Amino acid sequence: MADDTDNPPNIQIPAKSYGFPPEAFDPRRLPDYDTNFLPAHDLEAFIQALAAPDFVQSPDDASSMRLNSPGLHSPSSLDITKDDYDHSEARAALASVADVAAPGGGNNHHRRTSTGTFFSAHNDWAPVSEKVIKTDRDEKRNKRGKDRKNKKPRKGVAPLRTLVGTRSKDETREGYLYSLLKWPFLLFVSFWIVGLGMAYLATRFYIYFYEQFVAWRGRREQLRRAMRATGNYKDWVAAARNMDDFFGNQRWKEENDFAYYDSKTVRRVWDQMRRCREKAEEVERELESQSQNSDSGVASGEETSNTKAGGGNNGNDKKTQPVEDLKALIEACVKNNFVGIENPRLYSQTYYGTKNLVQNYVDEVERSIKFLIDTKQLTKEQKRVMFKGICANYGRTALCLSGGATFAYYHFGVVKALLEVDYLPDIITGTSGGALVAALVATRTNDELKELLNPALAHKITACRESFTVWFWRWWKTGARFDSVDWAKQCAWWCHGSLTFREAYERTGRILNVSCVPSDPHSPTILCNYLTSPDCVIWSAVLASAAVPGILNPVVLMMKNRDGSLEPYSFGHKWKDGSLRTDIPIKSLNLHFNVNFSIVSQVNPHINLFFFSSRGSVGQPVTHRKGRGWRGGYLGSATEQYIKLDLTKWLRVLRQLELLPRPLGQDWSQLWLQTFGGTVTIWPKSIPSDFLKILSDPDPPRLARMIHEGQQSAFPKVKFIANRLKIERLVERGRRETRDRRNAANAFTATGDGEGSYASHSIVDAMGGKHPLAPSSSGGAGDRRGSIESILSEDDLRSLLIKGREGVHTSGGSSTGTEDELTMTELEGEDDDGGTSRVSEGGSRNRYFEGALEEEDGALEVAASDHSRT
């Protein structure tokens, strides 16, 4: 994280630079190195939000007393309270909170800081001042209750209860056997799990030595070292092809048959698609020749071309038949994992590439889609409907960055590898430490990222700079090692200031997602993005996603208002680390953005230890028996799988039988029982010293190694990702180019009765005060990837304005009313990204539209704006 200093840091160029040039270690070359993105008023708003009590988390705590009671803030009002002199500590705590939370904290010393206890009648008829005569029995009972209430706990008991954790009354099961057998059964299962863990480590050591001294020897070891020493993707591909030639994998590529996909169907579809495209290209050339040689000129030639494309003349039916067949074939075959062509095993038998038949099919689909985008034989409406259906069936791709403390810096290498070949997905999600990397990627353009992803970035990572004596006393007093305010100052640089999720989407076109877990163990997890929480400030979500119990206390999410000020989001509730429940939010991504192809970079240390692919993974085949064997032999792989499955079984037993306590008030069972992988899972190779430095800032040499290892782990997956993304981006291009781009400016002109003027102003107000046809003010590479002009047609906009005018007349409002008199109706429907539009909690109602209204089949649906790649 960022640490602003006036003196330039020392430049350290290690002996082993991992292919980085000397200037890559100079921090002064980093963009915005000395920029302080966090204004003082934003930081002050965050401090006040942290000081405010969380009523949901601790409604009965002394810190959650009302700050708006008449006796505290309204001296002029009728004071019907009395001082409670028995809670001096509570009054002092309340006074400190009030001083921090008040806007003019320095002028609040004269206010009353006593807590108020309101009088209440015994019933509806008894007066307030009625004298109540207490019996001796009541006095003794009240005295015993006060003594029990005022009894202080023994030293060490309260921290121990917090550390061990307890369940509430509603969560605790009843029964004598449960109470008697709970702890013995917990001890037995715990010892058994420890024994299984030791056996698993022994098995992994056996497999490691087997591969090092049996599988990798001689020439193959030299080729592997040469491949791991490469610093860019081009050199890696050359080294990977040498490995394939040595192991004879080329013969496997030439054979079409394979058990994990339908080779016969792929071959038939490929031949038919190629023939249809070639015939359609011949017809296209004939139409272009007729258009150029026409006696009536260019205009009549275009009209003739459009007439032929419409298929209205019987003489042209044969000419339009090839393109119709090609269109039908593309609609039927361009689907997610069609007949198994996206099976990871197709890319797990070689170091580079896949079956020649599969590669030919992918290349032919790419050429056919390009032809359908540019052809004149289909109308724009036909193309629009076609690409809309293909987009829904094919889905989208997302890059998921896991948590893992300082292990998360391996993500820099993964992002750098994908950025080098221009295959970085537009949808990015991060959790805990991965959220910090995802925020950096989603708030910077490609050109900025290429300058940032260097070892010099280590000079901005200073979150763990404090000495042991400093952070230990903070942990002893507050229960957290790090300070939330200090992390907010540093995190703002990584998030490019107080950008919201919507503003980051506008700046780079990338969709950032951050997982956050509420402090309440039973409340649902939230996935922050520009749809669910558009006005939420990114750096606050990153802090919340990194708030591991014991490391960082839960924090408040912040929301940006229309005037740029910050205030607490979601009623001031506090949130914490998202990896405790959903490290990889696959289901939420599919719900909001139709993601069905996930690239997961997994670096969690407690998960990385248990990763083992007995049959090889994408770009990393098994060397034993030419890819048809088992890693470590069959006995080693079978033992590893059995122990790992048995460990999972006993962890589920602990959770289902409610045997586990809740240390620090958190259910930790999900740490091992989640889904941690995706369609493609990248596992950067760590070293033992990373576990010792799990909460230590990396220096430039260490960060250079982590970036290099991240690249090396991502290079084998690039070919698989490339075959997926090049088709997906062509489909997005077809969607973008087939939308109606006619000028919608005339829809904003005022009509005679002034209704058009009012409707246009309401649209401008809904867009945050910016005209939809106004150019972007950011300029350069930072421009957003699309504009409302490119996604909103004239007819759609007129329909929108008519709906707005009808709403005004129905409510009886005037055409000259203010923006508060016109509320926007929530539109529910399927958007282009497969998600559902909704009014998010804490979002402003008068924001501009993120999608265009398309009227099709008599129904309105909200279409999210697609953006062209920067």
Swiss-Prot record:
GO terms for biological process: lipid catabolic process; triglyceride metabolic process. Residues 818-834 have a biased composition (Acidic residues). The active site is at S432 (nucleophile), D577 (proton acceptor). Keywords: Hydrolase, Lipid degradation, Lipid metabolism, Membrane, Transmembrane, Transmembrane helix. The chain crosses the membrane at residues 183-203. PROSITE patterns: PNPLA. Residues 131-141 have a biased composition (Basic and acidic residues). A motif (GXSXG) lies at residues 430-434. Residues 142-155 have a biased composition (Basic residues). GO terms for molecular function: triacylglycerol lipase activity. Residues 1-24, 131-158, 281-320, 735-786, 804-870 are annotated as: Disordered. This is Patatin-like phospholipase domain-containing protein NCU11180. InterPro entries: Acyl_Trfase/lysoPLipase (IPR016035), NTE (IPR050301), PNPLA_dom (IPR002641), Triacylglycerol_lipase_N (IPR021771). GO terms for cellular component: membrane. Residues 399-590 form the PNPLA domain. Its EC number is 3.1.1.-.
